[in-house]
Structure formats: C-alpha cells, structure tokens
Amino acid sequence: MRKLFLRVVVFFWVLLFSINAFLYLKQPGMVFYPLKEIESTPREWGLSYEAVHLKLNNKTKLSGWYLSHPQAKNTILFFHGNGGNISHRGDSIYIFHKLKFNVLIIDYAGYGKSEGVASEKSLYQSANVAWQYLINNKKTKAENIIIFGRSLGGAVAVDLASKVNAGGLILESTFSSVRDIVDIAFTKWSKLIYLRYDFDSVSKIKKVSSPVLVIHSPDDEVIPFQLGQYLFESITAEKTFLEIRGRHNEGFMQSISSYMPAIKAFSLSLP
C-alpha cells in the first residue's frame, strides 16, 4: 500500500513537472503573436508620417511611426497589444489624429520591421527607448506626453508610467497581472502553474502619479472586465473609468460616440 501511494505521489509530481515544462516552453507563443509584414502605412490612410528608427541596447533596431498634428498640445505614446504590428492600428492612429494629438507608435522587438525577440524585458526596454526619443529627439515635454496602452500594451504603459512623470496615462482593455488572468482561467489549479511572465501592472500602478483613464468593456471576451476594474481600484492617482461596449478588439470603434469625447475630455483636464 505504501509503495502504491509513493508511486502515485511520484507520478503526480512528474506529471506536474511535465505539464509545467510544456507550458513554460509554449508561453512565448501564447503571449506574443507578432507579424512581420507591414500591410499598410499612414500614407494609405491619408496621413503624413515620419518613419522612426530607434535602437534597443545600441544594437537591436526598432521601427515606428511619428505623426505630427499642427494643432497638437499633447503627444500620444502608443503601445499596442500582443498581436500583429503597427500597421494594424490604423483606426486608433486616425482617431488620435482627429483628436489633434501627435502620435508615436512603435513595434516592440520582434514585431513588424523591428529586430530582436519579444519578451517581457524587451517590451519594457522598447517603451523606454520610445520615451527617450520623444524627450531627446522631438524635444517633447514630459508633461505633454500621454502614455497609451491597449491590452498587453497596457502592461507596457504602466511599467513606463511608473518610472517617468508623464502628463497622463490611458489604459484600454488591459489586465492587472498575468497571474490574475491564469487564476480566472484555471481557478484552483492556477497556483500549480509556473509562469514565465508577470506583467504585474497591479503592483506598479500604485507608483503612477499621473492622472489615469481606464477604458474597458463588460463584453470583452479576452481580458475579463473584472481585471480592468481591479486595476482601476488599485490606482492611487487621480483616475477616471470609462465603460464601453463591444468585444476586445472592436469595442473602442463600437463605442466611438463615447470613446472619443472621453479621451478628449481627459486630455483637456491635464495641466
């Protein structure tokens, strides 16, 4: 009986180790969905732009676009989600242009024309390089930069905002942490899963002093609405919550009548 019990215990731990090893190796493909092909550019959307070339760690080349607006006071530093690349963010770029913002959007390492490999560390580093480009190359004042992050880009935005004094922070359809997502998806078994990534926004958000606008939809089928609410509740700075309607990737367009005015009002409320 004792031998049987020991065999069951050993089998359980071997199985758990095997599952974790498999998931650990698979996690990059589950978190990052980069596409290399640039399918369109702002010029095809009727917007003039400047191709931006940055360097990560003085070696890895990053690619992005800078769009200026003659009446802009603020600049949107745009961090997109985990799929595609900057060429799939035309709707958002056009909206920000209509709202009279300058826009800098970059592709993380491994996305679009950017070199390297996507990782949690390289995403954070890419964000810092983009920030420094605005400050040093475009001579943009920190208080005139609004950091914007959608979905996974929200975690990138929070990390950067916790380290700099931006004018504002907009988080759309994002989450509190990867652990919280796994807890919801796997419930009681989640603590047995070893995670390769943290993206722990809920801890970092407490260090953000800039005003924050959080946008989320109860219809979001990718990032649970409750995680957006949890992140919002953890903010200690001045904050606003906008509830939109629609699915994860389409909600902002389906709620355009409330979405655009809310972003405009938020920007006007900044010092």
Map each language-model feature to its residues.
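Hydrolase active-site cap/lid region
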Residues: 154-210, 243, 251-253, 257
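Short beta-strand/loop motif that positions the catalytic acidic residue
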Residues: 208-209, 214-216, 220
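Catalytic histidine neighborhood in serine/cysteine hydrolases
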Residues: 232-251
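Short alpha-helix in the alpha/beta-hydrolase fold that links the catalytic acid
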Residues: 92, 201, 210, 224-233
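Membrane-embedded segments
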Residues: 57-134
